[in-house]
C-alpha cells in the first residue's frame, strides 16, 4: 500500500478506470458475438441493426481511450466486410 497521499489517490482512480474499461470491453465482446450469431443464422436485417450498434459502441470505446482508434476502425471494417459477404 502506498504511503503518499497522491499515490493512494492514483490507486483508487486506477481501480475505477480498470473497472470501467473491463465493463466496456465486455459489452463490446458481447455485442460482436451477437452480431456474428445473427450473420451465421442468416438474419441479415437483424445483423445490420447489430452492426450499427457495434459501430457505435466501438467508436465510443475509442473516444474514451478504452481501445485504440485504429483497432476500433479495423474491427468495424472487418465486421462490415463480413456482413457484405453474407449478403
Swiss-Prot record:
Biological process terms in GO annotation: translation
Q: What is this protein called?
A: Small ribosomal subunit protein bS20
User: Can you cite an annotated GO cellular component?
Assistant: cytosol
Does this entry carry the keyword Iron?
no
Keyword Transport present in the record's keywords: the answer is: no
Which superkingdom does the taxonomy of this entry point to? Bacteria
* Annotated keywords: Ribonucleoprotein, Ribosomal protein, RNA-binding, rRNA-binding
Q: What does the organism's lineage look like at the top?
A: Bacteria, Bacillati, Bacillota, Clostridia, Peptostreptococcales
Task: Give the family, as the similarity comment puts it.
Answer: Belongs to the bacterial ribosomal protein bS20 family.
Tell me the name of the encoding gene: rpsT
Read off the Pfam families from this record.
Ribosomal_S20p
GO MF annotation terms = small ribosomal subunit rRNA binding; structural constituent of ribosome
What is this protein's function? Binds directly to 16S ribosomal RNA.
Disulfide cross-links = none
